[in-house]
């Protein structure tokens, strides 16, 4: 669960994780605003294809007492809202939605015995998304928070992990196959 994601192209990153199941529990952590806020971002989500949603990033809840980088302070507190639209709603296996103005994210869940394989794919809608490596490091860090939530273990420090991974993902993206 520590492996970095892979850039399938400079405009798409895929991260695979094995999570403790059952799949319905993992689905709840993706779709229930209160549970999602514990590891990623809260906010309402209409449970249907075409449904409206709003992610509310308020990282003081997942990184209490941590100091974020200057350009991310608004995410720590007071928080940041991102509207979106649900693209796929296939409980409890597939969730996809728009992310920011230029990209989409998809979560695919597959049962593997008592565990669940999560495949997260974040892709630019256009040809390129210059800051996709930042999104990739964010997803990697947020998924570490999700794993801790599901396992009932202490959360790793968010911002130090994010900073380290951002540099790693920038290198990985530079070596991605060209589309």
What kind of feature is each model-predicted range?
Residues 23, 81-83, 106:
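Conserved beta-strand residues within beta-sheet cores
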Residues 88, 94-148:
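Beta-strand/loop substructures that line and gate deep hydrophobic ligand-binding cavities in soluble
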Residues 124-179:
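A conserved amphipathic terminal alpha-helix motif
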């Amino acid at each position: 669960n520590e492996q970095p994601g892979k850039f399938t192209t400079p405009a798409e990153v895929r991260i695979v994780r094995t999570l403790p199941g059952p799949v319905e529990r993992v689905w709840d952590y993706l779709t229930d605003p209160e549970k999602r806020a514990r590891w990623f971002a809260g906010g309402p989500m209409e449970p249907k294809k075409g449904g409206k949603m709003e992610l509310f990033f308020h990282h003081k809840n997942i990184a209490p007492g941590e100091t974020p980088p200057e350009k991310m302070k608004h995410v720590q507190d007071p928080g940041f809202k991102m509207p979106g639209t649900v693209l796929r709603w296939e409980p409890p296996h597939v969730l996809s939605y728009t992310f920011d103005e230029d990209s989409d994210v998809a979560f695919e869940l597959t049962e593997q015995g008592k565990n669940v394989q999560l495949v997260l794919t974040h892709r630019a809608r256009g040809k390129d998304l210059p800051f996709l490596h930042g999104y990739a490091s964010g997803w990697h860090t947020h998924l570490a928070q999700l794993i801790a939530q599901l396992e009932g273990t202490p959360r790793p420090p968010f911002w130090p992990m994010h900073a380290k991974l951002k540099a790693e993902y920038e290198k990985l993206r530079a070596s991605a196959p060209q589309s």
